[in-house]
């Protein structure tokens, strides 16, 4: 057992027995891990309000394979403005659940940690914009290695630059040329260009989709994400319930 300190974002929390909690964390230094917080339900002195979903923490833990032990936590930020807005809460929960479901345990990924932290920070500071969700999804897929083919045909590898007709299908790994995607769903070249720009741009708030582009990008990204999930996302159902 190794005693360490690390920076982490809380992905999820569940009760364990009468007094304890099991916390799923995404850490900068060690990737995703689960930690047991003893007596977290009975006493707030040890952890205060730190063990809340999508809080950013500095952790003290005894690390071991399977289930680590949380010995203490210092709050970096709880993203207070997110917690005052139901739509922002839904999107923060969605981002954290995506990371939890798509990332294996104990696999360090600095880029993904920074992406998630940047999205939560942007949600906290600015009014929610649907384009930011698509920006996060596109970059998440890129960082974890599930990026859909956007510049070349996913079927024949033809260069899509200047193509007049572009399509995609849920069974494809990206966008198809006119010859390969005769029965696929149409997608505008401008939508594809914006998705490519989103993955080349390092900051939230710089890419904005029109309503039509949002719909097209959303359909493609949702399909690209869904094929890597074994069951539906609870947070996505919540977003639909609140009309987002």
Swiss-Prot record:
One GO term (biological process): DNA recombination
Superkingdom of origin: Bacteria
Pfam family, one: RecO_N
GO cellular component: bacterial nucleoid
InterPro entries in the cross-refs: ARFGAP/RecO, DNA_rep/recomb_RecO_N, NA-bd_OB-fold, RecO, RecO_C
Similarity section: Belongs to the RecO family.
UniProt function note: Involved in DNA repair and RecF pathway recombination.
Protein name: DNA repair protein RecO
Organism: Geotalea uraniireducens (strain Rf4) (Geobacter uraniireducens)
């Amino acid at each position: 057992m190794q005693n360490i300190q690390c920076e982490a974002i809380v992905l999820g929390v569940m009760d364990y027995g009468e007094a304890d909690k099991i916390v799923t964390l995404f850490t900068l230094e060690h990737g995703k891990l689960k930690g047991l917080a003893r007596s977290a339900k009975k006493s707030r002195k040890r952890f205060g309000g730190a063990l809340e979903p999508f809080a950013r923490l500095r952790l003290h833990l005894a690390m071991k394979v399977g289930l680590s032990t949380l010995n203490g936590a210092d709050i970096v930020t709880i993203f207070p403005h997110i917690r005052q807005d139901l739509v922002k809460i839904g999107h923060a929960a969605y981002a954290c659940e995506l990371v939890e479901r798509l990332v294996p345990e104990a696999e360090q990924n600095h880029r993904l940690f920074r992406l998630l932290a940047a999205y939560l920070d942007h949600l906290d500071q600015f009014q929610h914009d649907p384009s930011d969700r698509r920006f996060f999804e596109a970059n998440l897929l890129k960082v974890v290695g599930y990026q859909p083919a956007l510049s070349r045909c996913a079927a024949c590898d033809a260069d899509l630059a200047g193509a007049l007709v572009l399509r995609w299908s849920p069974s494809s790994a990206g966008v198809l040329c006119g010859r390969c995607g005769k029965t696929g769903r149409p997608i505008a070249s401008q939508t594809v260009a914006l998705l490519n720009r989103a993955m080349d741009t390092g900051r939230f708030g710089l890419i904005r989709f029109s309503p039509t582009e949002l719909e097209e990008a959303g359909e493609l990204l949702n399909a690209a994400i869904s094929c890597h999930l074994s069951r539906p996302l609870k947070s996505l159902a919540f977003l639909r319930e609140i009309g987002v």
